[in-house]
From Swiss-Prot:
<keyword id="KW-0675">Receptor</keyword>
<feature type="topological domain" description="Extracellular">
    <location>
        <begin position="272"/>
        <end position="275"/>
    </location>
</feature>
<feature type="topological domain" description="Extracellular">
    <location>
        <begin position="1"/>
        <end position="36"/>
    </location>
</feature>
<comment type="function">
    <text>Odorant receptor.</text>
</comment>
<dbReference type="InterPro" id="IPR017452">
    <property type="entry name" value="GPCR_Rhodpsn_7TM"/>
</dbReference>
<feature type="topological domain" description="Cytoplasmic">
    <location>
        <begin position="297"/>
        <end position="321"/>
    </location>
</feature>
<keyword id="KW-1003">Cell membrane</keyword>
<feature type="topological domain" description="Extracellular">
    <location>
        <begin position="150"/>
        <end position="207"/>
    </location>
</feature>
<feature type="transmembrane region" description="Helical; Name=4">
    <location>
        <begin position="129"/>
        <end position="149"/>
    </location>
</feature>
<dbReference type="InterPro" id="IPR050402">
    <property type="entry name" value="OR51/52/56-like"/>
</dbReference>
<dbReference type="InterPro" id="IPR000276">
    <property type="entry name" value="GPCR_Rhodpsn"/>
</dbReference>
<feature type="topological domain" description="Extracellular">
    <location>
        <begin position="92"/>
        <end position="105"/>
    </location>
</feature>
<feature type="transmembrane region" description="Helical; Name=1">
    <location>
        <begin position="37"/>
        <end position="57"/>
    </location>
</feature>
<feature type="transmembrane region" description="Helical; Name=7">
    <location>
        <begin position="276"/>
        <end position="296"/>
    </location>
</feature>
<feature type="disulfide bond">
    <location>
        <begin position="103"/>
        <end position="185"/>
    </location>
</feature>
<keyword id="KW-1015">Disulfide bond</keyword>
<feature type="transmembrane region" description="Helical; Name=5">
    <location>
        <begin position="208"/>
        <end position="228"/>
    </location>
</feature>
Length: 321
């Protein structure tokens, strides 16, 4: 801790690094969380890498629906990797210090990947909406060009709109307190340590949540509402049941993702202290969706399972050689 604070004159002390204390209230027991965290991280990396490889190598999966799944897998890997290595370092090696530039970089990466995840959810909802509600027009609407434009739009939107978050945090003055009762650099947890006014930071955080994640959430739910309405009108009971089963699985993950974001944001904005439950939710909605998304969105898709067997079967590997 001796390197964490630097005294510039007799009355002014500036922070040069933060100390991430881990999960609040259970610091002496948090080592027991390391195993499930590590397993979830391994699953997130392994399952999503398999999805990416399968979609890339199997020509029959070079379709918009599976391309969005591939983008989601890449985003999930990025989202988990921006935070989990540091969390595991804290739990296993007590590596609690993090420099200000590293902390601000983590804030930017987490916000960008979270917004990207939300954007991919929206693209996938639109893709399913067009496929179910306008099946004849689907091939001409959701094309490869549409996927490219949607992906570039998401990258541009999220990359630019999240830049002010770490920039505004870096402009604050951190005078003496440098301990964050968290296991990652949460923006609102960091700026709560500032010794100057953080009104602009809080306002932009709220505006970003509503303009990006909030609007995506509304459009996603609206898309699935229209999908369910169309499905209920189908004459085939079997087709309707299959579509509703798929939509319900998707909606469970989407509801978990967006509900966790809302709870964490409201809790942070309501006060300066970060309780245990919001911190756990904050971490879980970064780690759990990347682990579950490959199962719910991908591995339940018959075409992808067939593609996986073809790509990783020995006979197919030999024939490609």
């Amino acid at each position: 801790m001796g390197t964490a604070l630097h005294e510039t004159n007799s009355s002014e002390v500036h922070v040069s690094e933060f100390i991430l204390l881990g999960f609040p209230g259970i610091h002496e027991f948090q080592i027991w969380l390391s195993l499930p965290m590590a397993l979830l991280y391994i699953v997130a990396l392994g399952a999503n890498l398999l999805i990416l490889i399968t979609i890339y190598l199997e020509p029959t999966l070079h379709q918009p629906m599976y391309q969005f799944l591939g983008i989601l897998a890449a985003v999930d890997i990025g989202l988990a990797t921006t935070s989990m290595p540091k969390i595991l370092a804290i739990l296993w090696f007590d590596a609690k210090t993090i420099s200000l530039p590293e902390c601000f970089a983590q804030i930017y990466a987490i916000h960008t990947f979270m917004c990207m995840e939300s954007g991919v959810f929206l693209c996938m909802a639109i893709d399913r909406y067009v496929a179910i509600c306008y099946p004849l027009q689907y091939p001409s609407i959701v094309t490869e060009a549409f996927v490219i434009k949607a992906t570039l739009s998401m990258l541009l939107r999220n990359g630019l709109l999240t830049i002010p978050v770490p920039v505004l945090a870096a402009q604050r003055q951190y005078c003496s307190r440098n301990e964050i009762d968290h296991c990652l650099c949460s923006n609102l947890g960091v700026i709560s340590l500032a010794c100057d006014d953080i009104t602009v930071n809080r306002f932009y955080q709220l505006a970003l949540a509503w303009l990006v994640v909030g609007s995506d959430m509304i459009l996603v739910y609206a898309s699935y509402a229209l999908i369910i309405r169309s499905v209920l009108r189908l004459n085939s009971t079997e087709a309707a049941s299959k579509a509703l089963s798929t939509c319900s699985s998707h909606l469970i993950l989407i509801m978990f993702y967006y509900t966790a974001i809302v709870i964490v944001s409201v809790t942070h904005l309501a006060g300066r202290r970060v309780p245990l439950i919001p911190v756990l939710l904050n971490v879980m909605h970064i780690v759990i969706p990347p682990s579950l998304n490959p199962v719910v969105y991908a591995l339940r898709t018959q075409e992808l399972k067939v593609g996986f067997r073809k790509v990783f079967s020995l006979s197919e590997f030999v024939s490609r050689k």
